[in-house]
Design a protein with these regions (language model features):
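Structural preference for solvent-exposed beta-strand-turn elements
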Residues: 1-156
Length: 156
């Protein structure tokens, strides 16, 4: 097969990828680790991303959330953080968000005030999901995670 591609005029512009729950949650949690202000555009508006936003705030970051009027279907979020995670709240609720729960557990080991215990709770649906092997792995790495009846207690 032989294909010939002739040059055309320069293409200029931007393409906006559809919002993704997975990318949105990861972006929010990574922004909490950054020192300074991170801007996320077209963040998916969902229960999982709402849970992730609350977790990021509980870890000491400030969020400025605006509806994305340019494209009309996502959120624009400015996350300001020192890059040093602090536990502002002794209880963190992750709702139904498995990705938030699993990502925040190791992040809690990086807290400046990691000697202060923090309790993670989630929905009954999430409590039914397996997480024991993940907790055991994190404990082997030096974290002190204790599985309670309906929540998880973390202290380093």
């Amino acid at each position: 097969m032989r294909i010939i591609v002739n040059p055309t005029k320069k293409i200029n512009g931007a393409a906006l990828a559809p919002s993704s729950k997975s990318h949105s949650v990861r972006g929010l949690l990574l922004a909490a680790l950054a020192d300074g202000t991170t801007e996320l555009t077209n963040v998916l508006e969902s229960d999982d991303t709402s849970a992730a936003r609350k977790v990021v705030e509980a870890l000491g970051a400030r969020l400025n959330v605006k509806k994305n009027n340019e494209f009309g279907n996502g959120l624009d979020i400015e996350i300001t953080s020192t890059g040093i995670l602090l536990t502002i709240s002794q209880k963190i609720f992750t709702g139904d968000s498995g990705i938030t729960t699993r990502f925040v557990l190791p992040l809690l080991g990086l807290r400046k005030n990691s000697d202060m215990p923090v309790q993670i709770d989630c929905s009954p649906q999430m409590r039914a999901r397996p997480i024991k092997s993940f907790i055991e792995t994190l404990n082997c790495l030096g974290m002190k995670i204790q599985s309670l009846n309906n929540s998880i207690k973390i202290q380093n």
